[in-house]
């Protein structure tokens, strides 16, 4: 998929700020933007952080049927036969998206739609199969922007500093 871009980075590195900048840019270009996340809580946070309406990926794809441990009873109204009508789709908290949901999302996107996947591959993994974000990053087949500098005010907290040190293989401060 040639319209895919990945934005990744640890906590406090500016992912949300970058999402807001992209939204303003795409709106100024007159493009239709959809915002979504894998959970209701993440979608609500995305709405609050951007001031734009975000929904779950399931709602974006218009889920019908029952969501359970298998995908056998799940059907999405938005699919290859009834694709999403968006110029840009931004998905936050991508680390929680499994292979089945990613397949459904890609099936509902037409060529020319920009898909921007945002997340931290070191955060919560998906409950279902696959590590989609991590695998896409490791594939190096798509443009990846990796934010590394901590901007959030809590950047001086020992927890944030040590989390980044552990990720970088450095000695932690106790």
What is the role of each PLM region?
Residues 1-174:
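Conserved ATP-binding/catalytic motifs of P-loop helicase motor domains
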């Amino acid at each position: 998929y040639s319209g895919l871009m990945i934005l990744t980075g640890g906590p406090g590195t500016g992912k949300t700020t970058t999402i807001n900048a992209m939204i303003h840019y795409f709106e100024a270009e007159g493009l239709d933007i959809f915002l979504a996340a894998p959970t209701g809580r993440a979608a609500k946070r995305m709405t609050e952080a951007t001031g734009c309406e975000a929904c779950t990926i399931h709602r974006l794809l218009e889920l019908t049927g029952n969501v359970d441990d298998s995908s056998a009873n799940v059907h999405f109204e938005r699919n290859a036969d009834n694709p999403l009508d968006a110029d840009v789709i931004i998905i936050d908290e991508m680390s929680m998206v499994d292979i089945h949901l990613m397949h459904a999302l890609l099936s509902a996107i037409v060529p020319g739609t920009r898909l921007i996947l945002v997340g931290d591959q070191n955060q919560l993994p998906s409950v279902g199969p696959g590590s989609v974000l991590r695998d896409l990053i490791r594939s190096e087949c798509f443009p990846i922007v990796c934010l590394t500098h901590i901007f959030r005010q809590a950047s001086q907290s020992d927890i944030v500093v040590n989390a980044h040190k552990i990720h970088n293989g450095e000695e932690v401060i106790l």
